[in-house]
């Protein structure tokens, strides 16, 4: 079924990932095994959680920073490039001064123009984040490679790399030193695993990204990382806990002391609340 879906239509990676996730959930329940076990051993039982700081109103994000710190979260990713450069610098300064307990990552989400990409990336590199993600447009491999050569901080590719085909090209052109791996972006767990394995073999670091998902959407990514030792930089499966008003899982998405807890129950490990889905559905 998946082989047919992969080639029946170009792109549509989220739909393909949803189909594969449903089939793997079914297979796991038939075999009485969690999805991660279908791929081998569990490499991580608890995955470090990163929460993104992305509100144009930084006063609201200051409250979020206090909350997640109290919850035991120790990784944050600052979304940058959507307002002024000074706004980005101000927030970096604030986080470094008032939240030294938090490890900082930076994500431009393609927010910089090519001509400003290097200088602004280097400015934020002075705050020594763990990595800086996708400063310029996805297709601009030339500028990504230029920044990668001169940036003292790990440069991560996101929108530039969707699946195995992209990561091979990205490695050959040396556009980064790491990649954000997403089940929905890659077109499923299997293709995401392959992308991570190719990247790691080339010496790249891998991070577990997501696509603004509910708890149900997070779960395939959890099983991906649990079964994939190549993904070492944690995950960003925070929406179900910190942003979704009402999640659609029957129980809370499993987060404990700043870590996502990998489920061991059959299939994806949690079931959707059908009554909630029905109530939230458009009719």
Language-model regions, residue ranges each:
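N-terminal amphipathic alpha-helix/helix-capping segment at the start of soluble metabolic enzymes
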Residues: 28-29, 33-46, 260
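Metal-dependent enolase-superfamily TIM-barrel catalytic cores that perform enediolate-based chemistry
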Residues: 38-151
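Conserved, mostly hydrophobic/aromatic
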Residues: 19, 32, 76, 107, ...
């Amino acid at each position: 079924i998946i082989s047919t879906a992969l080639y029946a239509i170009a792109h549509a990676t989220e739909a393909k990932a949803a189909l594969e996730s449903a089939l793997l959930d079914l297979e796991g329940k038939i075999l009485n095994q969690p999805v991660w076990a279908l791929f081998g051993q569990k490499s991580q039982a608890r995955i470090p959680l990163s929460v993104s700081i992305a509100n144009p109103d930084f006063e609201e994000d200051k409250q979020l920073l206090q909350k997640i710190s109290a919850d035991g979260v120790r990784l944050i990713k600052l979304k940058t490039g959507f307002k002024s450069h000074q706004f980005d610098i101000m927030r970096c300064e604030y986080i470094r001064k008032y939240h030294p307990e938090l490890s900082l990552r930076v994500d431009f989400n393609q927010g910089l123009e090519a001509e400003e990409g290097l200088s602004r990336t280097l400015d934020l590199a002075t705050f020594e984040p763990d990595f800086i993600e996708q400063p310029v447009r996805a297709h601009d491999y030339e500028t990504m490679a230029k920044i990668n050569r001169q940036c003292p901080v790990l440069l991560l590719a996101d929108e530039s790399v969707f699946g195995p085909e992209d990561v091979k090209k990205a490695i050959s052109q040396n556009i980064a030193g790491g990649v954000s791996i997403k089940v929905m972006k890659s077109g499923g767990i299997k293709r995401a695993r392959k992308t991570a394995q190719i990247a790691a073999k080339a010496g790249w670091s891998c991070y577990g990204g997501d696509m603004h998902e509910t708890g149900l959407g997070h779960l395939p990514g959890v099983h991906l990382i649990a079964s994939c030792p190549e993904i070492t930089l944690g995950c960003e499966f925070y929406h179900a806990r910190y942003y979704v008003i009402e999640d659609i899982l029957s129980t809370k998405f499993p987060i404990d002391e700043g870590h996502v807890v990998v489920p061991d129950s059959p299939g994806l490990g949690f079931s959707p609340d059908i009554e909630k889905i029905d109530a939230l559905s458009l009719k």
